């Protein structure tokens, strides 16, 4: 795959969509850029009959609700979306049976920060301020294989319903999620 290409699993349609050669990409690195970027994307998709495939990071949450807090950003954009002509239906390349390299993951937070966050979540639940929190943090690792291979192994191991592979150029996003965050149909 090349920069800008993507695979998206569509559980409802029972297929995978392959997006190739974006006509444009849109990225937002600051919270203040997220909503204008989404508005511009929506306009272009409607006007130019394009498809949009990408991601919005959890850290973009304050763009939608200023009461939300998110940690300071890093070099990963808060939003990255490719604009494409119609995708092709298909399946990602099959994974050959072979052992996977050992990957040593490093959390983006230390143990004390994790313990503090869990204590705060428990306090909020006990106080009745929330009933559920989806707590996440980033993991980083040096891969001993191409990101595409890691993605195929993740899909084979997890059998997710809403997997996605996004080659954003400088970054690759591999997601093996069991649920869809949002979908916009016209």
Name these PLM-found stretches:
Residues 1-186:
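Extended alpha-helical targeting/anchoring segments
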């Amino acid at each position: 795959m090349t920069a800008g290409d993507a695979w998206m699993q569509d559980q409802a349609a029972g297929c995978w969509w392959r997006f190739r050669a974006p006509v444009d990409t849109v990225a937002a690195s600051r919270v203040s850029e997220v909503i204008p970027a989404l508005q511009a994307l929506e306009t272009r998709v409607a006007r130019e009959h394009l498809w949009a495939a990408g991601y919005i990071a959890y850290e973009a949450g304050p763009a939608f609700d200023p009461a939300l807090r998110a940690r300071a950003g890093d070099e990963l954009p808060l939003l990255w979306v490719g604009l494409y002509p119609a995708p092709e239906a298909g399946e990602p390349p099959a994974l050959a049976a072979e052992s996977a390299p050992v990957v040593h993951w490093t959390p983006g937070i230390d143990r004390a920060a994790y313990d503090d966050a869990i204590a705060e979540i428990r306090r909020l639940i006990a106080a009745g301020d929330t009933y559920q929190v989806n707590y996440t943090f980033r993991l980083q690792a040096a891969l001993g294989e191409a990101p595409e291979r890691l993605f195929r192994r993740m899909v084979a191991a997890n059998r997710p319903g809403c997997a996605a592979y996004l080659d954003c150029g400088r970054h690759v996003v591999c997601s093996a999620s069991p649920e869809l965050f949002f979908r916009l149909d016209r």
